[in-house]
């Protein structure tokens, strides 16, 4: 078992949290605590789920929840862009990172569900 901070998925998820923190900081006050707070909370939970999956024998449930929370974060990011709370370029950067985390999590989950060879 590798240290979770050395995993490629962790590094990308941390970058996502960093980007989201900057996005939320610049949101209008009315939306900062509602939409912005929820996006930040989901991203923190994604990082925590990576840690849990790395430590657990049965990784699939944690990875399934991670993928679900990633979808919620993407939905809230899209809403933020549609409401013009963030720019299209900021949205594109965040979605690039969520896509990378999603691909890695899906591959890790597939690997965890496959019978040991």
Per-segment meaning from a language model:
Residues 1-117:
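Amphipathic alpha-helical assembly/interaction segments
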């Amino acid at each position: 078992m590798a240290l979770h901070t050395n995993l490629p998925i962790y590094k990308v998820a941390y970058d996502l949290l960093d980007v989201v923190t900057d996005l939320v900081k610049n949101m209008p006050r009315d939306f900062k605590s509602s939409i912005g707070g929820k996006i930040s909370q989901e991203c923190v939970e994604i990082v925590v789920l990576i840690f849990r999956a790395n430590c657990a024998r049965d990784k699939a449930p944690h990875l399934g929840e991670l993928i679900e929370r990633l979808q919620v974060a993407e939905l809230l990011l899209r809403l933020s862009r549609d409401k013009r709370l963030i720019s299209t370029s900021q949205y594109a950067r965040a979605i690039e990172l969520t896509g990378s985390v999603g691909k890695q999590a899906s591959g890790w989950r597939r690997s965890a569900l496959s019978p040991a060879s």
